[in-house]
Amino acid sequence: MRNLLSAHFARLWRSGWFWVGALVMIWFSWIGVDSTRNMLNYGEPASVLDFTLFYVQPLSIALPVFAAVFLNGDYYYGTIRNKLATGRSRTAIYLADLVLIFLVGLIYSLAFLSINLGLGLSLAGAPQTDFLPSWNDILQGLPVSLAVALGIAALSVLLARLVTHRTVPLTALFLGMLLTFAAQWIDQILLIPTELPVYDEAILMVDDSGEPVKGYRKDGVDYTPEDCPKEPNPNCVGEPIHALLTFAQNFSPMGQAYQLSRNSVGTLSASPAPPGVLAAFALGFTAVATGTGLLVFRRKDLK
Amino acid sequence: MRNLLSANFSRLWRSAWFWLCGLGMLGYTLWEVSQLYAFRAHALTVWEVERADFATPRVGDCSLLLLIAMAVLCPLFLNSDFHDGTIRNKLVVGRTRAQVYLANYLTMLAAALLYTLLYEAVLLLAIGFTVPENLWNAQAVTIKLVGLMPFILSVAALFTLLVQLVRSRGVTVLSILLMVLLLWLPRQQFDRLCEPEEKTLLGGAEVFVEVDETGEPHQFYWRDGQRISEEDLETVPNPRYLAPPQRRLYTFLLNFLPGGQAFQLSDSIDVEGGSGPLMAAYGLLLSMLATGAGLLAFRRMDLK
């Protein structure tokens, strides 16, 4: 196993794709810093900490693509046969790949965080107010994000090892994008409220402190959004589907990444699972993906 | 050269990637037509317009998807020359590297033109047969179609350059990254160009929106329990406002690079100082530069 890892690392530093992936992570981090700087310029509440845990989202695309390009070289150049011929077991090869891809994921995360925190704190800042994430939120979220990164690494190795065709990087890219869009779409569905207010017109009311707030008028009576009579929302999804979608959002690494990064900007996510639960799902996914990958890889005809 | 083109085209018709990208283009065209129908219904019922020019604003809308299609097709189609080793066969039978490069460029150019033809044919026929309210402006439509040609030349040249010089099977990923960069950069640059010279400081004021009797929304400001107007707010120079030298650079890049041209051709952004003839000239220039550089580099490349 040590020889396999040593061979991987020797190839890693010389691989252009590794540096391209790191640049992509740095680019995404810079977008977050620039966006924060822009919002602060206009006096809007913003913080670079909004984007700190966001790193898992570009990682969920960059890491599978990198793994696909890097590990596919074993099939393309036939080096996998050399590894097996020298007595390495398929399990050892697969696990060495998983360790490598997870470590690459950590390096990519560090690249992202160095721009986000290193450059971001000096160029933009991290104001601490009620609606912005605190350092405590970030410290709690970081271990969870590492578990999610492990899940992403497991998915990447599963795809890269089971698909031998040279177009696997494209498959990895499309799968990453598809699952990320699916996570956004599921979140939108889960956000549909179960009840809707019944009213004749929306009005502007003045509350006790003299501030204008949104209200509803029905049959001549003014209500606040909380007091207004409500009816069931016909667009809301029924129970078996709702539970299924919630499970899918929690089990998929892209769904976990979405919840993690959305959690850091407040309760925008429909179903933010508590950090411990999210981490457990991430580790569960890792176990299932790795177990499946090992089972199939051991029986696979490697020609 | 004729043999090379004939071999390339016979491979193109049998290539699944060519048909898949074509299917994507068709799907986008049909979506565009459905959006047109929705817009037409809205214009006729809500705005009570009797006739309007629906065709001219939509003729250039294929530019964005063409950029994406070329970014996907070029590497998937051309890279197999390296992967299957057919490039060696072409050189062994006496073809020059320049001929191989140009044949590949012309094949990708033909694919791009076919995709554009598909889009324009479906769009214009749909309007012609199913939108009797359309006011045809043949001159404007022709000018837009002619303006698309240098753009197509430059996009095909740029992606052929990339794919011919990168032998690795991961060139598809690089190509898609380039396409994402070409599409992301113009929006960033345009947003910066739109930044005002001065910005308003709220100074503790809150912003609210009210709707008057005619249904028009109006913004008003509230500070210390009092309603104030926009003139009462302080203005300071905007640090994100671009100074003239940088403005000129950003405007140049928006007009020169295919990404910015794609957005302008599809009327998504309106760049000050951008015009059809200028973009056409830049498109021709970029295609010549990319092809020239590609030919030079390809001749020196170690093909192993």
Which stretches of residues belong to each language-model region?
Chain B
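Junction motif at the cytosolic side of a transmembrane helix
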Residues: Y282-K304
